[in-house]
Amino acid sequence: MPKIKTRRSAAKRFSVTGSGKFKRRKQNLRHILTKKNAKRRMRLGQSATVDSTNEKAVRRMMPYA
């Protein structure tokens, strides 16, 4: 049985925490930042965890994580 390939796109976007959850970056922080206030931009800069609904899909894309 051959090894399962890791989806490289997922590996670049997600990282595994010590507890086994997946960490991700928040969206909306690339451009059009002038209309977003400082508080919102700071919140968007923090990392978030992957929702339980999507965790199964991410785990399937990264079999060795």
From Swiss-Prot:
Domain of life: Bacteria
Record carries keyword Chloroplast: no
The protein's name in its UniProt record: Large ribosomal subunit protein bL35
Ranges where the record places region Disordered: 1-24, 41-65
Family (UniProt): Belongs to the bacterial ribosomal protein bL35 family.
Species this chain originates from: Nitratidesulfovibrio vulgaris (strain DSM 19637 / Miyazaki F) (Desulfovibrio vulgaris)
Alphabetical UniProt keywords: Ribonucleoprotein, Ribosomal protein
Record PROSITE patterns: RIBOSOMAL_L35
GO MF term (any one): structural constituent of ribosome
Encoding gene per record: rpmI
GO biological process, one term: translation
Stretches with biased composition (Basic residues): 1-11
A GO CC term assigned to this protein in UniProt: cytosolic large ribosomal subunit
